[in-house]
Amino acid sequence: MPAKLPDDTTLRLPRILCLHGGGTNARIFRAQCRVLSTLLSPHFRLCFAEAPFPSQPGPDVVSVYRHFGDFKSWIPMPPNPSISPTNVAKKILNSLRHTIEEDDRSGADGEWVAVLGFSQGARLAASLLFQEQNGGSGMVGVYGGVNFRFAVLLAGRGPMIPLDMDAMASVSSAVLSLPTIHVHGLQDPGLEHHRELLERYCNRETASLIEWEGNHRVPIKMKDARVVVEEILKIAQKTGCLVPPTIQGGGTSNCGALLLDR
């Protein structure tokens, strides 16, 4: 079941769709993103989607989250030839639609302005933004409030996941030109694959890169998370989806403003 931030002060805020890595789930990703979520909460509502396919837990998951199953993947692992790419795409999009509809039912009504993913979820995030760029069907365009303007790609690799075969067949370029934020851990064993996503599949003029001294995980130290959030707020401002700090607990939260002014 998708996991959402329960704070009702976020109901009116623009929303970011968050996609976990393979071999984890929405609950785990919410925990992994706890520092990013706190820093972004004055400006965005983060909603965590659950992948459709059962999976074994990822190698770095068991040590901390082994009791947090069931574990899921965005694509069948290992690959299952009995499930066509079209059916894989349908299952993915159905999971995302369920997340969107459930959050709408909770009373949230902010526009869906960005997508954030880690590892396999980052690959899907890039694919969703590419679909948005090329006018594909699926979830983009079906819901009036879905208008992804940028993506945050934490340790992501290519190639794109084909979510709309007809749209993919008609595009003239496989390069993602909508804004992307790439977050690379310099100690990550998959670093070269993450750099390939940036260099081969994304337009360097609209892509920004953050490198940090970490391995294959979401930044959780405040000093590392702040750098990521600063870039998110910068791109959000450029794309017109940054909301001024909200009133919480009788006072004004200036977390985002402070980050931008630093």
From Swiss-Prot:
Q: Pfam families from the entry?
A: FSH1
* UniProt xrefs under Gene3D superfamilies: alpha/beta hydrolase (3.40.50.1820)
Q: A single Gene Ontology molecular function, please?
A: hydrolase activity
Induction of synthesis: Expression is under the control of the azaphilone cluster-specific transcription factor azaR.
Identify which top EC class this enzyme belongs to: hydrolase
What's the EC number here? 3.1.2.-
Pathway(s): Secondary metabolite biosynthesis
Q: Alphabetically list the UniProt keywords.
A: Hydrolase
Q: Which InterPro entries does the record cross-reference, listed alphabetically?
A: AB_hydrolase_fold (IPR029058), FSH-like_dom (IPR005645), LovG (IPR050593)
Superkingdom is Eukaryota
| Presence of the UniProt keyword Hydrolase in the record | yes
Could you give one GO CC term from the UniProt record? Answer: cytoplasm
Tell me which residues this entry annotates as catalytic: 119 (charge relay system), 188 (charge relay system), 216 (charge relay system)
Q: Does the keyword Methyltransferase apply?
A: no
Q: Biological process GO terms, please?
A: secondary metabolite biosynthetic process
Q: What does this protein do?
A: Probable esterase; part of the gene cluster that mediates the biosynthesis of azaphilones, a class of fungal metabolites characterized by a highly oxygenated pyrano-quinone bicyclic core and exhibiting a broad range of bioactivities. In the first step, the non-reducing polyketide synthase azaA forms the hexaketide precursor from successive condensations of five malonyl-CoA units, presumably with a simple acetyl-CoA starter unit.
Tell me which family the UniProt entry assigns to this protein: Belongs to the LovG family.
Protein name per the record: Probable esterase azaC
The organism encoding this protein is Aspergillus niger (strain ATCC 1015 / CBS 113.46 / FGSC A1144 / LSHB Ac4 / NCTC 3858a / NRRL 328 / USDA 3528.7)
Q: Which gene encodes it?
A: azaC
